[in-house]
């Protein structure tokens, strides 16, 4: 680097300078002539003062320089360096005038190599985005009512405890299947990708959570792996990522179907609270009952209107009988006339009566057909409503914890009645109670198993 020196002050034109004048002039010269720059080196002699300022030496194999980082800048670094750490410091060159020592005044710091990692992150992000792997249209919404939820993470991760706690609180009826894999290290990305593929092969869960807690960019780097990102993008099971904290973003977050800011938030996105589901089912059942009653009332009203419009055959026969009696009376009165006149008159009346006689048989058949049609309509409506109620009842029974126990799961409580989710909370000879589908079992703890530290164990189940 070529640095042009330009001194506007005529202090150096004096014959004699004091030490203070010299140091002040040199300090101004350094600050005006050398721009802010990045310097790579090893941390040594690190001290964090009570004021919050950092004082350390930045060195390599051939030289060293004193460095200061004031509290406001140090608070933005995100980690506290230790002696021996390789770092990259953004600083300005200055002079500590009381001693005449030149030093670096740092206003930024990152671990050495982070710049290269970030550049690799941006290249892979741009490549996968160009391929359409970030396209919102290819992403799917997780199942609203999952039959089981899978979790891909380390068995020893705090994130796993957070996820299991959130799921037990919100949806205790949903089984959780853990696919254990390391979340950092040389082979972590490959192991995580293998677990995602295994979950798809088994097809035993409806939603997959890929989670880990926070950390540095190096700690989270496994989740920026291209092979893992492509495995997540190709998953037939919707994937929710919950990696790091809210401000952390990885490549997996961009290809996942849904991104959560934390592992706990990922668990909350994966299921609807059980209380909300039961309330919705009750509301739906009440609505269906009211709707069915309205349909039945409307059908009854239509039946009443149809009955009112249909003249009773008995009434028509009675009317015709009355008419016939009247004609007979008139015939008897007219019998006293000439015989021929009476016979002709009688024939005429008989013909008129024949024309006015109601077809009672046809009217009765039509009435019976209408009643049968109305009965069939009511039966179909009642059958449809009963089938819908049966379906809702089956869904409600599926949410019952007793139904889950009937499938072979069990609930373990300690002596205080609290549900046991962590074996390490118990000790030998502790009294426990095991609830199964039909009854409860009292037992004493004789042995406690703990994880052996190997992340390649078969998938564990929690019912």
UniProtKB/Swiss-Prot annotation:
It catalyses: Exonucleolytic cleavage in either 5'- to 3'- or 3'- to 5'-direction to yield nucleoside 5'-phosphates. The keyword Cytoplasm applies. It is an enzyme of class 3 (hydrolase). It is found in: Cytoplasm. One of its GO terms (molecular function) is exodeoxyribonuclease VII activity. Its EC number is 3.1.11.6. The keyword Disulfide bond does not apply. One of its GO terms (biological process) is DNA catabolic process. GO terms for cellular component: cytoplasm; exodeoxyribonuclease VII complex. InterPro entries: Exonuc_VII_L, Exonuc_VII_lsu_C, OB-fold_nuc-bd_dom. Keywords: Cytoplasm, Exonuclease, Hydrolase, Nuclease. Bidirectionally degrades single-stranded DNA into large acid-insoluble oligonucleotides, which are then degraded further into small acid-soluble oligonucleotides. PANTHER family: EXODEOXYRIBONUCLEASE 7 LARGE SUBUNIT. HAMAP family: Exonuc_7_L. Heterooligomer composed of large and small subunits. Belongs to the XseA family. This is Exodeoxyribonuclease 7 large subunit. It comes from Bordetella pertussis (strain Tohama I / ATCC BAA-589 / NCTC 13251). The lineage of its organism: Bacteria, Pseudomonadati, Pseudomonadota, Betaproteobacteria, Burkholderiales. The gene is xseA.
């Amino acid at each position: 680097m070529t640095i042009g020196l330009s001194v506007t002050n005529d202090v150096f034109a004096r014959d004699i300078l004091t030490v203070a004048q010299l140091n002040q002039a040199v300090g101004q010269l350094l600050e005006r002539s050398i721009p802010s720059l990045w310097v790579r080196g090893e941390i040594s002699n690190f001290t964090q003062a009570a004021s919050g300022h950092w004082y350390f030496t930045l060195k390599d194999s051939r030289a060293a320089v004193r460095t200061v980082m004031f509290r406001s800048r140090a608070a933005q670094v995100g980690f506290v360096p230790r002696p021996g750490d390789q770092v990259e410091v953004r600083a300005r060159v200055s002079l500590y005038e009381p001693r005449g020592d030149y030093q670096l005044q740092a206003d930024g710091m990152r671990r050495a190599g982070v710049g290269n990692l970030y550049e690799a992150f941006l290249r892979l992000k741009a490549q996968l985005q160009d391929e359409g792997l970030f396209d919102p249209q290819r992403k799917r919404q997780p199942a609203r009512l999952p039959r089981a939820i899978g979790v891909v993470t380390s068995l020893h991760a705090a994130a796993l405890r957070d996820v299991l706690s959130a799921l037990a609180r919100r949806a205790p009826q949903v089984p959780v299947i853990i696919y254990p894999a390391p979340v950092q290290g040389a082979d972590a990305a490959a192991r995580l990708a293998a677990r995602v593929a295994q979950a798809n092969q088994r097809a035993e869960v409806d939603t997959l959570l890929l989670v880990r807690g926070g950390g540095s960019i190096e700690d989270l780097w496994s989740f920026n792996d291209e092979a893992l990102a492509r495995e997540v993008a190709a998953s037939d099971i919707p994937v929710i990522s919950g990696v790091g904290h809210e401000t952390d973003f990885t490549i997996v977050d961009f290809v996942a179907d849904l991104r959560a800011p934390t592992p706990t938030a990922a668990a909350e996105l994966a299921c609807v609270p059980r209380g909300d589901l039961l309330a919705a089912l009750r509301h739906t059942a009440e609505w269906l009952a009211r709707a069915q009653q309205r349909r039945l009332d409307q059908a009854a009203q239509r039946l009443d209107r149809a009955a009112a419009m249909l003249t009773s055959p008995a009434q028509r026969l009675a009317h015709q009988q009355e008419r016939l009696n009247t004609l007979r009376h008139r015939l008897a009165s007219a019998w006293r006339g000439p015989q021929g006149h009476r016979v002709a008159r009688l024939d005429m009346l008989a013909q008129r009566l024949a024309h006015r006689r109601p077809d009672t048989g046809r009217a009765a058949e039509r009435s019976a057909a209408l009643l049968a049609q109305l009965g069939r309509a009511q039966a179909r409506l009642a059958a449809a409503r009963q089938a819908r109620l049966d379906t809702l009842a089956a869904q409600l029974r599926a949410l019952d914890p007793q139904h889950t126990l009937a499938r072979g799961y069990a609930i373990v409580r300690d002596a205080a009645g609290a549900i046991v989710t962590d074996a390490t909370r118990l000790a030998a000879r502790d009294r426990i109670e095991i609830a199964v589908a039909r009854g409860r079992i009292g037992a004493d703890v004789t042995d406690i198993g703990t994880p052996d530290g190997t992340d390649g164990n078969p998938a564990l189940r929690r019912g």
